[in-house]
Amino acid sequence: MFEIKARDAMGRLGVITINGKKIETPTIMPVIHPNPKKQTVSMDLINKLADVVITNSYITYTTPELREIAETKGIHELIDFKNVVVTDSGSFQLSVYGDVNVGPMEIIDFQEKIGVDVGTILDIPTGPDVSREKAESDLLETFKRAKDSIKRRKEMGYKLALNGTIQGSKYLDLRQKSAEVMGKMDFDIYPIGAVVPLMEDYRYREVAEVILNSKMHLPTNKPVHLFGCGHPMLFALSVALGCDLFDSAAYALYAKNGRYLTAEGTLHLEDMKDLKSFPCTCKVCSEYTPKQLFNLEEKEKTRLLAEHNLYVTFEEIDRIKNAIKEGNLWELVEERCRSHPKLLNGLRVISKYMDFIEKHDPVSKKSGFFYTGYESMDRPEIYRHKQRLERIQYDKIYVTSVSENTSKPYHENLSNVPCDVDVLIKDSVFGLVPLNIDTMYPLAQNEVPDLYDFEKKYNNEFVSEFREKHTEKILDISTYNYYINHYGKKKDCDKINPDIFRIGKMLEYQYGAKILDDELMGKVKSRRSKNTGRIRNLLLEKEVLFTLRANDNFLIPAKYGAELLHEKLEFPNYRIVIDSSVEEFARAGKSVYSKFVKDCDHELRPFEEVLIVNSDDDLLAYGTTILNGQELMEFDYGVAATLRGGIKK
């Protein structure tokens, strides 16, 4: 069972529950050697740091003394780990040696027998440089084994969860096919396999595309494991692309070669020995100088270096979790991807997939938008803004430029004449910013440095396309000046209240429909904050309809605002339909759980304001969705939406 608690980009801070044990994602599974004598780092440290580990059931199976202990006392006792134990099935050995001495069903039976929490099918790992024919043949065999493994578990009543590995080599259509076929089977976790050769060759562009083409066709309610990814420099990007789990033997393997892991890359202990101190404050790096560690006996040096590598690996995972909570994962990704040019290639290629990524990215975040480089132009916040500009119902449009020194929000720093013309400011980062919505996230909640000329020109084509699309509504400067002069001479009773006009446009941008019709425009009133002077509420006959949330200026409905949205928005827009059995809980303002969602607006994005209705479209409650439209239909565990209030009968 998998539940999302917080999110940013496609990264998910979640909880996986297996056999009553909980794993917080994203996380790393240290690779544990099933033979305790060959384990580099003590299990006391592993138990302290990790919720989950991965070990090899094939080595256990083929080593008589290990097999005997595992079969009599269980895998947890063998490796001395009490929480979740995942096992590989021998696929790695198959990829290295070309053959294994165990059958697909035999290894499933063994993993169940030794009490594994999550087992793995004996799939066929297919490297990146094989022919297409070979990749297709291997994939068909993996499908057969996967189907047989699921059948075996069901027929035998096995309790172990199962990994269903996605294969397909470097062929993206085969990765898509693999995800589609495997995704329809009842697997619990979906590892993306055979990417280690790509990572070893720094082919991060291909790694990113393999992840995305797999994710696009996998069920959203199951965790995704990036098999063999153990270097912390790749974690942030992989999490942002939707990977929840990683496994690492790198902490030990790198230590044996004297390699010192950091979140930005790999250093060599020999090259560091003349430094006064380490660039790390973990227990090992605090107790030893580089020279002291380098001069230790080889076995002890390897152990301590492996401990550092493990510490820094978990430190990066914790940093990513915090970035998800704070809403600045993209900034961390951009920082990490600048640590190596090949990793930057991985970041740049994802712009091709922004239509997919945007569906999973929250509509609002705790942190503002920080522009850290040219790649920031392709972030989902900007992509979404450009799409949602078309939601606004324009009558007359005037497009203009402002000085680079003009502070945001623009409308507070320009001598703009209030009228019913939509004034759009050309913006180097966001393309076009309508003055009437310029306080909404992320249009005012951003920090951008001085840009190079080529960056300033990035959105020229977008602006030209917008002008061409709306050419009949575009006013030139002469027409605009004439119009505002004429408008200014109107009697006050004939003029539109600029605050109400502004709120109307904000509602169109946020909800995709005209919420304030002409009749309502004349009845509603705005209320400004006494402290800031900014619009704070929209009221109708002294009842609050909407409150403008201070941090992002989104319009948050109160009870009467929810009823107005329900009246103005066509079904199923901005709705979550729930089962009749929990109607009263919704009316009482209780959270909506995923298993009770019957239908929804499939275009919902995470953290949008939603209406909770029954199958007859009766309004029951209103609140905020945690999940997007696809997830609402696929998740069957955890909270789907938190409620702000219920509607009593």
Swiss-Prot record:
Exchanges the guanine residue with 7-cyano-7-deazaguanine (preQ0) at position 15 in the dihydrouridine loop (D-loop) of archaeal tRNAs. InterPro entries: ArchSynthase1/Queuine_TRR, ArcTGT_C1_sf, PUA, PUA-like_sf, PUA_sf, TGT-like_sf, TGT_C2, TGT_C2_sf. It comes from the Archaea. It comes from Methanococcus maripaludis (strain C5 / ATCC BAA-1333). Pathway: tRNA modification; archaeosine-tRNA biosynthesis. SMART domains: PUA (SM00359). Substrate binds at D123, A194. The active site is at D88 (nucleophile). Residues 573-648 form the PUA domain. Binds 1 zinc ion per subunit. This is tRNA-guanine(15) transglycosylase. It catalyses: guanosine(15) in tRNA + 7-cyano-7-deazaguanine = 7-cyano-7-carbaguanosine(15) in tRNA + guanine. Its EC number is 2.4.2.48. Its cofactor is Zn(2+). Belongs to the archaeosine tRNA-ribosyltransferase family. CDD domains: PUA_archaeosine_TGT. One of its GO terms (molecular function) is pentosyltransferase activity. One of its GO terms (cellular component) is cytoplasm. Zn(2+) binds at C280, C282, C285. GO terms for biological process: tRNA wobble guanine modification. Keywords: Glycosyltransferase, Metal-binding, Transferase, tRNA processing, Zinc.
